[in-house]
A protein has these predicted regions:
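Extended low-complexity intrinsically disordered regions
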Residues: 1-57
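Hydrophobic/aromatic-rich structural module bridging two neighboring secondary-structure elements via a short loop
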Residues: 58-78
Length: 78
């Protein structure tokens, strides 16, 4: 699977979470309600990078990507 195909699969998962039959919690979220989560994940990623802990950094950067992509999709839905 190419990187583009993998990202599309990831994005399709986000769309499914926000769909009418998706996750109730995800459907209730707004960019503003997710703002603090994005900030927290970014700081956690920075801490992991500062600690020079690649595995932890990858995990936290994944969380940043998830939050940023979710928020971007929310704006796309408007």
């Amino acid at each position: 699977m190419t990187a583009q195909e993998e990202f599309q699969r990831f994005f399709d998962t986000i769309k499914a979470l926000r769909a009418p039959n998706g996750c109730p919690w995800d459907k209730e979220q707004t960019p503003l309600s997710m703002r603090n989560d994005l900030i927290e994940e970014a700081f956690e990623a920075l801490d992991a990078i500062s600690e020079q802990n690649p595995e932890h950094a990858k995990e936290e950067l994944g969380d940043v990507i998830l939050n940023a992509t979710m928020i971007s999709y929310m704006y796309e839905q408007e």
